[in-house]
Amino acid sequence: MSFASETKKELTNLEMKECCEKSELSALLRMNGSLSFSNRRLSIDIQTENAAIARRIYTLLKKGYDVTVELLVRKKMRLKKNNVYIVRLVEKSREILADLHIVRDDFSFIRNISQELIEKKCCKRSYLRGAFLAGGSVNNPETSSYHLEIFSLYKEHNDSICELMNGFDLNSKTLERRKGYITYLKEAEKITEFLNIIGAHNALLRFEDIRIVRDMRNSVNRLVNCETANLNKTIGAALRQIENIRYIDETVGLDILPDKLREIAQLRRDYQDVTLKELGEMVSGGKISKSGINHRLRKIDEIAEKLRAGETVAKK
């Protein structure tokens, strides 16, 4: 089961206040429902591939309106051939849609979220929970980039969801897709806040555990890469220094170098694996700092480059 499916399964087991049940159900019917007329009767089909969500819708309708509800199961014939669960409402369809503020009394469609559904903070959380159950998805934090989104067919409703989320300081953004609109989150911290808002506390804990391990692994990798880069840089510098010292020795001899440079050149040539700090501790006349050793080695590099350019180098 995917991380998103586990999250939704957890949400379908939450208990709610009566006012919150109405808010969640409104989001579920608005986003997953479709209307049809048969034998001069209006019916509502709420379709989902998630059995737990279908049971949730069925229970909320029975509890809230005491109506006859049908639960149908069909199998997709394409792609994954998953089961499709259809919750069918044939009684009081018009009255329920009006009560859930999906249509007006004249049966015109309400495209945004009615304020009556989200007057209380608990109801705002419940509407977002219903919206996530109906059209939401969240990436597995273990295998991909952090991303949570809620899909809506209508721009006005999508903008309302974004506004509702940002009322909780989530910094959500909207984007137009080919067949609708999405409100999305990209920051890991905001995704965990959203999971907390809608009541997915187990999913939140798992997300955070994975995120901590993942961030720690990334930090270690960055540190290792940095250490490797520094090591490669150090090795490259040492090889260059040794090559330059050999070139000077074979061309004009190390005796051409000033005494201080000649001593460092001989030490670098004879002890190729030691660090600059260790070289500084090996010189006669007292310890020299790494920067001091580096300075002398740069002077040796300059002399080697002059010799390669055909210039004459006299001993100073």
Curated annotation (Swiss-Prot):
Gene name, Swiss-Prot/TrEMBL: whiA
Keywords recorded for this protein, A-Z: Cell cycle, Cell division, DNA-binding
Disulfide bonds: none
DNA-binding region boundaries: 275-309
One example GO MF annotation: DNA binding
Signal peptide start and end residues: none
Role, per record: Involved in cell division and chromosome segregation.
GO BP: any one term: regulation of sporulation
Family named by the database record: Belongs to the WhiA family.
Protein name: Probable cell division protein WhiA
Organism, scientific name: Bacillus mycoides (strain KBAB4)
